[in-house]
Amino acid sequence: ILVRGNTNLGDMNQVSGSLMGVSVVLPILNEERDLRESVSAILAQSYSAPFEVILALGPSTDRTNEIAEELAARDSRVVLVDSPTGRTANGLNAAIARAKYSIISRIDGHAEISPTYLRDATELLNKTGAVNVGGIMAAVGKSKFEKAVATAMRSPLGVGSSRFHTGGKAGPADTVYLGTFKKSALLEAGGYDERFTRAQDWELNFRLRKNGGTIWFDPSLVVTYRPRSTIKALAKQY
């Protein structure tokens, strides 16, 4: 793995009050459309503890990697690692291997987190004792096609009845959208299984629960998700 950025200094458990340092990890492939907005939302977080943003760059065919280089040049908190296969699980594991903080927050390159997301997620980890917390996947489209997909993604008829799609009460769950993890539990479980090209999150959360950990859903954690813009891109996702 080629790392561009500061050398990893190990697992740095820096604390600001009760908040721990966070490594935000993103698997990135062909995210030219949304990458700037996604990373900007992370860098603008209202979070008093230190955090970093690790982009695992796959073999994109658009301007994604150029944009990532620009973001890293402008802000030292942005770190780039190579993910030669471009697969989600591989990229996440590459980013986690580079992470220097004790909390891992997984975000996507076409998703935007709310301004207090990192603070809220970290506080929930402390409050609930869970090993992973997550909330609502708020799908929002801009084009007619994206809006139609977003509507389907918010409906039980479109994607099933998972609370992270349709909402619900806070509490233990089988899985959550994206997730903010205790790094120790994530490493103990072995990280993401790179044999999976789909459902990596569900499978990882299954192993975390098998190890005795709690997965916690809370609707106050909101992530705005922009659906794929074409039928072809959507088909690749599912």
PLM feature segments, named:
Residues 82-99, 120, 176:
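Glycine-rich, basic loop-to-helix element that forms the pyrophosphate-binding segment
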Residues 193-238:
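Catalytic donor/gating beta->alpha subdomain of glycosyltransferases that bind UDP-sugars
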Residues 104:
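Short aromatic/hydrophobic "clamp" motif used to bind/position activated sugar donors
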